[in-house]
Amino acid sequence: MKIALLTDAWLPQVNGVVTTLLELVRELEGVGHEVQVVHPGLFTTRPCPGYAGIDLAVRPGRLVAKMLDDMQPDAIHLATEGPLGWAGRRHCLRRGLAFTTAFHTKFPEILHAALRVPLSWGYALFRHFHRPSSGVMVPTQGVLQMLAQRGFGNLRLWTHGVDTQAAIAN
């Protein structure tokens, strides 16, 4: 299967989302899938205001559309709700393509703490982003319950597990 993975979180960032996605790609490729990652390094970027070390793609829409059209993937996963996720979402909706999404980070809380954006606004925006998804992947039962209480639908539990080889080595 050919899978397009769109993410605003990728190397050289070091965080839990990047670690999760790197392992996902490794595991998928290990069982024979072809994964093409669409990440900020393929675009003109600007630093994310107030979030050191995070670069965001600037106006990625046309290039994302071209990349997805050229790839002709069997599956599309939008891993993040940043510019690449929104561009992928827009393209999929225009073309009538199914896609999945993931909720990795309580970003509405970050927006609230950093910019005083009301939590209700942040979660409304994220509900809008995830609503057309074929499935919203969430990391824990607790996150699933929290999002369900906030009106999110189509939630799917996607536990990340532990890399036992890395745990043993350390």
What are these regions (language model features)?
Residues 41, 142, 160-161:
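Carbohydrate-associated surface elements
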Residues 64-85, 95-100:
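Short N-terminal targeting/anchoring amphipathic segment
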Residues 83-84, 142-144:
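Alpha-helix capping/helix-boundary segments
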Residues 40-71, 78, 118:
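A short, charged, and often flexible helix/loop element on the N-terminal side
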Residues 3, 75, 90-110, 130, ...:
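Active-site proximal beta-strand in glycosyltransferases
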Residues 98-100, 109-128, 138, 164, ...:
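Nucleotide-sugar donor phosphate/pyrophosphate-binding loop at the beta->alpha transition
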Residues 1-44, 71:
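N-terminal subdomain of nucleotide-sugar transferases
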